[in-house]
Amino acid sequence: MDPIRFVTHQGQRVLLLDFTASTPDQVAELSSRVPELITQEPKGSVLVVADFSGVKFNREIVEHIKIATAIDRPHIKRAAWVLTENLPKALYDSIRSFSAREIPVFDSREKALDYLVS
């Protein structure tokens, strides 16, 4: 199953970015694919959840994510991340600052999906 795919949650279409337990190289490769997909959608229309459970973050991964979140910003209606205390606050803050986006963090995919469609 493709880790980047649209799913339906409570009748709404949500883009799932499933980075669960991915290596740094996998996260970098997958995050580089995201903007091309999202920018094909109408502006302000995409609900997106990124699940980073079990990912070991480093500065390289953060740089890839910063770029992707900045490029796709106009197309995002709402976004949420799933993190399990694996992203240091300073790195999370640098992504938020660079992308000029507020990205709420949840401890489970279900909670993140519920937030997106609420």
Could you say what each language-model-derived stretch is?
Residues M1-S118:
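Amphipathic, Lys/Arg-enriched alpha-helical "gate/interface" segment within cytosolic domains
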